[in-house]
Amino acid sequence: MSGCPFSGNSVGYTLKNLSMEDNEEDGAQTGVNRASKGGLIYGDYLQLEKILNAQELQSEIKGNKIHDEHLFIITHQAYELWFKQILWELDSVREIFQNGHVRDERNMLKVMTRMHRVVVIFKLLVQQFSVLETMTALDFNDFREYLSPASGFQSLQFRLLENKIGVLQSLRVPYNRKHYRDNFEGDYNELLLKSEQEQTLLQLVEAWLERTPGLEPHGFNFWGKFEKNILKGLEEEFLKIQAKKDSEEKEEQMAEFRKQKEVLLCLFDEKRHDYLLSKGERRLSYRALQGALMIYFYREEPRFQVPFQLLTSLMDIDTLMTKWRYNHVCMVHRMLGSKAGTGGSSGYYYLRSTVSDRYKVFVDLFNLSSYLVPRHWIPKMNPIIHKFLYTAEYSDSSYFSSDESD
């Protein structure tokens, strides 16, 4: 049967749909263009004229414009902008600790939120190397001669970041056999010196951990009970292995037991801890380490959930900074091989030496896993008696709302 393909009910249905779409389109155009009435607009608010005109290609100035220099500049400027945001978040967290606001535990969520934001930014910075790696070594070599003596080591913000988090000056790898600050002059040098004299995030977290509820000898006395349980558990473990028939497997288990025993008993040797602290192998005070371990073991308890998340974020930051350094090393090796850096350093070899625990700030938190024990060795708590697990400390004089935070 033939006929008009547009006859029948289908026409009404189609027209109806078109009518509905027209109505939706009309609704989408009912807004008001407030920008036309004057006032602050997008470009002015973001200062885009300054930002988007801040890319001066040295190759172009020298009369030999190289395309990939633009990518090189943009990528490093993006890094510096994100470093600025990280410092902004870090300074706000340090201020919360310094002013004693953490004594009101309601403020810990704000601390945790901002530190998590730093973690997310660092993840972005680690991934950002993949953009720069779209440039080949030959492409980079085309404009490298125009960069000297500029160097990534001269990033003031990254050095400030290291100092404010808590990188030990005594553990820094010398740059061309000089103190790192000697590569900065004037106001930059003074800013770095000031940042060395301020309380670091590590020191502030250390003081906070020392106040962990449950460490009090006349209270729950976690450390005393934990040591007692460890000694009892080790004795039971020894007798269990000793009761087995002589065999190669028994010898292996006994050797492993002795190693575990040495590690666990060293945990209760305060003098040894202080010695390792003086060498830079440990970073937290003895009591702060106790607090961190207590939070680690009781992380599922209501009062310790946010503190545990904070400790996890601190480890994430350390890990991501190490990954950032490593990615930087790999990129430099790929672009320069073993040649000297543009700033005069040994390049790849210098950068490679910075990818180590020397630059890890919260290394003690990573090492907590060394002290994992069977759950029944962990001191038990009675929630009826030990109400501190469910009763947070708060003080109206220490609490501040979002409006008062900055």
UniProtKB/Swiss-Prot annotation:
Could you tell me which InterPro entries the record lists for this protein? Answer: Trp/Indoleamine_2_3_dOase-like (IPR037217), Trp_2_3_dOase (IPR004981)
User: What pathway is this protein said to act in by its record?
Assistant: Amino-acid degradation; L-tryptophan degradation via kynurenine pathway; L-kynurenine from L-tryptophan: step 1/2
Residue positions of the PTM Phosphoserine?
Answer: S19
* Expressing tissues: Liver.
Q: Where is the signal peptide?
A: none
UniProt key word Oxidoreductase:
yes
Expression induction per the record is: By dexamethasone.
| GO BP term (any one) | L-tryptophan metabolic process
Q: Which cofactor does it need?
A: heme
**What is the catalytic activity of this protein?**
L-tryptophan + O2 = N-formyl-L-kynurenine
Q: Which GO molecular-function terms appear in the entry?
A: amino acid binding; heme binding; identical protein binding; metal ion binding; oxygen binding; tryptophan 2,3-dioxygenase activity
Work out whether the entry's keyword set contains Heme: yes
Detail which positions bind substrate: F72, I73, I74, T75, H76, R144, T342
So where does heme get bound? H328
**What are the disulphide bonds in this sequence?**
none
Residues forming coiled coils: none
Q: Which family does it belong to?
A: Belongs to the tryptophan 2,3-dioxygenase family.
Question: Which protein are we looking at?
Answer: Tryptophan 2,3-dioxygenase
Native species of this protein? Rattus norvegicus (Rat)
